[in-house]
Amino acid sequence: MQIKRFGFLAFLLAFSFSWAANASNQHGDEHGHHEEQDEKSIKEQIAEVKEHHLKDSHSFHLWGDHASGTSVEFPLPIILWDEGELHFFMSSAFHHSENQTVESKGSYFRLYHSKIYKTDAEGTIHYDEEHHATNAKPIDFSITKTVFSTILVGILLLWLFGAVAKKYRKDPVPRGIAKFMEPLVILVRDDIAKPNIGEKDYKRFMPYLLTVFFFIWMANMIGQTPLGINITGNIAVTMGLALITFFLTQFSGRKDYWAHIFWMPGVPYLMRVILMPIEILGLFVKPFSLMIRLYANILAGHVVIMSIISLIFIFGNWFATGAFFGLTFFLSIIELLVAFLQAYIFTMLSALYFGSAVEVHDEHH
């Protein structure tokens, strides 16, 4: 029992330390060439580190700095479509030239502020009056950090559920990983699907509800690692999940569901006319709220923890280091709860929308 408790505490400490290690490593890279960037204050450097962590990128940055030539990173595939031609190379190619320009089939591309632009051989970037890049951009199908991480989570889910199914085929009594997964599956079924959708219809929605629950939870947990993966802190990911829920809801809608939207029964005719645009607007507000809720909560968690870690470097003393590290450890434990809670809430609301779409109303007039 003591070994299990120690393992659990070590697990929590590892997650907490991962944040501090990641932030201190990136800040250390900035500090290493501080003499070359005297014009930048420590707050400006910290802001750059935060932006680097929160934004998507074309590689996994591990440690080091591009400016000093010490950067170590895991490159990802760059896939571009430009003027009828497909261009393919690894993201590391951008950092092998002095101006970060890559030549492919007679065209030149440059990675600038996490976006790829067409340039000349010198990598010239043109700007407008507001200092925004005006170069043409190819159609980018690249495997970015978020895309790679999403695929990785999908593979892990396939392996996880495949292993559970294999164990159940051999022995109906849950053992090993199946023993861990069964309570979570029952949680989704008995606490989310059945109460919100109903005994009659819940089974056809269970595959999606289980998938979205475990995907969000696992993505959020991976976001606690020092790799800087922030899957559900990317609004494109949360929008995709919300749209799937939206389309499943609309395609599952029965006659009563559409009747309550376009011609609300049981109310005066004038009120029906007033309620119709409100109900139609509600169709799109629901997925929008799903998207923003998940995105904002996860993004805010990353920002808060990185901000607290940054205070260590701003104050620059041992007392601040101990105090803020302790606070970071506490907030990291809270983030583990938030990771699960956001998966639960998204799944719960999705089931609630499905239930409203398939519900049959007994109206008596």
Language-model region placement:
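Bacterial N-terminal signal peptides
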Residues: 9-18
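Hydrophobic alpha-helical transmembrane segments and adjacent short intramembrane/lumenal linkers
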Residues: 191, 205-206, 211-214, 218-225, ...
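Membrane-interface helix caps and helix-loop-helix hairpins in membrane proteins
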Residues: 225-231
